[in-house]
């Protein structure tokens, strides 16, 4: 079975699949059309059409500019001239076996809630979340005493799939099951649209990974999230 025909094959290169598909409206594309990245404030991730093609790397370098930081996922060692700033082992989990369920306490979050969302993200560090990330999909939150204490939503949208992301709970409200309830609420929204859920997590975040596995997520692959600096052509 070819890579293209395997079920879920788009998840092998999810950022590219999203930017070349459902998230095309958020994409900035290289002049050769072989690399793309999310617009500023949306997500720091970039992608290559074919990570084995040197022309795609050159296209990404031209798109980002010399000496700029970019984040990629699941890619091989970059060509000479690229500096690796950070490498984070991760897991990619398939959520097709997870049962979605609407959450009565969940409220739909939008642009007006971004300041509170950013505050919660700063406190809990679930991963990259910018001023425009909320535009990528459905985000739900739970408030206590008028204060946002937990949230979860969608990020990458490869065709037929949606990534559950920004799952976080205020430290004072952990242990109440809020994360699991919000994940199921997002899964329900994803399934209602006819898509399947998946997610990424840092491999070292064993507590979160354990929660996801207990909910029915299954390990699909183990990508690496890599922060790179583009070649400094002026050097």
Labelled PLM ranges:
Residues 1-12, 96-127:
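Short amphipathic alpha-helix that is part of the acyltransferase structural core
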Residues 83-95, 200, 218-232:
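Conserved catalytic-core motifs of GNAT/GCN5-like acyltransferases
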Residues 164, 197-201:
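Conserved hydrophobic beta-strand within the GNAT/NAT acetyltransferase core sheet
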Residues 46-52, 167-174, 202:
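A short, internal acetyl-CoA/4′-phosphopantetheine-binding micro-motif in the GNAT/acyltransferase core
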Residues 1-78:
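N-terminal charged segments
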């Amino acid at each position: 079975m070819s890579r293209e025909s395997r079920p879920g094959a788009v998840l092998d290169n999810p950022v590219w699949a999203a930017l070349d598909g459902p998230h095309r409206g958020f994409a900035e594309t290289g002049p050769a059309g072989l690399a793309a990245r999310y617009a500023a404030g949306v997500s720091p991730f970039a992608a290559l059409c074919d990570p084995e093609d040197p022309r795609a790397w050159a296209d990404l370098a031209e798109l980002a500019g010399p000496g700029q930081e970019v984040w990629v996922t699941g890619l091989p060692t970059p060509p000479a001239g690229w500096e690796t700033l950070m490498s984070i082992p991760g897991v990619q989990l398939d959520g097709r076996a997870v049962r979605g369920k609407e959450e009565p306490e969940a409220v739909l979050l939008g642009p007006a809630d971004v300041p509170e969302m950013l505050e919660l993200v700063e406190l809990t560090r679930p991963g990259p979340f910018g001023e425009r990330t909320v535009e990528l999909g459905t985000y739900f939150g739970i408030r206590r005493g008028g204060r946002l204490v937990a949230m979860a939503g969608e990020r990458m949208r490869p065709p037929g799939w949606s990534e559950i992301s920004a799952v976080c709970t205020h430290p004072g409200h952990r242990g109440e099951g809020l994360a699991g309830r919000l994940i199921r609420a997002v899964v329900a929204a994803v399934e209602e649209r006819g898509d399947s859920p998946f997610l990424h997590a840092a491999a070292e975040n064993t507590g979160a990974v354990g929660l996801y596995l207990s909910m029915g997520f299954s390990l699909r692959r183990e990508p690496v999230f890599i922060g790179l600096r583009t070649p400094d052509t002026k050097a």
